[in-house]
Amino acid sequence: MMFPSRPMLCVITDEELPPVTFARQALWGGATILQLRNKTASGRDLCRWSEAILPLTRQHNALFIVNDRLDIALATGADGVHLGQDDLPATVARKLLGPDRIIGVSTGTREEALQAEKEGADYVGFGHIFPTGSKDKPLPPVGTLALQDTASLLSIPLIAIGGIQLENARRVISCGASGIAVISAVSRHPDPRIAAEALVREMEEGMLL
């Protein structure tokens, strides 16, 4: 699977916002990956949203990833699925998805990231890098040193996640991340499109450091 050579902006849908409208704004702002994530929505709603978001990503030459729900990804023709540590192993997901779709895996340690690559993940999400309020009772942040160390050992893209905002996006890229994954940095901005555009600019600056 080929990923963009420029830093990737993965925007994850916010459960408090209409996902299709939010996805459209993020894509106009330059998101290269749109991930549909909603832990409480019904399968029917996830299918409906996926079928609406997928053509939007095609219009913007972006990738569409479904969080956790392998069945939804398969049913709607999504580009891939993002799995957590408690979900199906990447090896099993690959048997179901086939060789051409993307599998991402959430990781929080160097060992988890290396294991995900060994099991056939196409990219890893790594973090959380900074303190974040998006998860209940989160573990301490792993920090940029662990990010730099882990990224140097992987041959697949590492997308940093957790507490990433405009003011630290450049530093994350300069530490070796292939991209960032965000929710609130885009969803809490009055204009998600402008927020996404600003993050893209900061990441491009980070490549020059």
UniProtKB/Swiss-Prot annotation:
Q: Which residues participate in 2-[(2R,5Z)-2-carboxy-4-methylthiazol-5(2H)-ylidene]ethyl phosphate binding?
A: T132, G133, S134, G163, I183, S184
In terms of SUPFAM superfamilies, this protein maps to: Thiamin phosphate synthase
Residues reported to bind 4-amino-2-methyl-5-(diphosphooxymethyl)pyrimidine = Q35, L36, R37, N38, K39, N67, S106, K135
Positions bound to Mg(2+): D68, D87
Does the entry feature the keyword Secreted, yes or no? no
Q: What does this protein do?
A: Condenses 4-methyl-5-(beta-hydroxyethyl)thiazole monophosphate (THZ-P) and 2-methyl-4-amino-5-hydroxymethyl pyrimidine pyrophosphate (HMP-PP) to form thiamine monophosphate (TMP).
Concerning its family, UniProt says: Belongs to the thiamine-phosphate synthase family.
Protein name as it appears in the record: Thiamine-phosphate synthase
Native species: Chlorobium phaeovibrioides (strain DSM 265 / 1930)
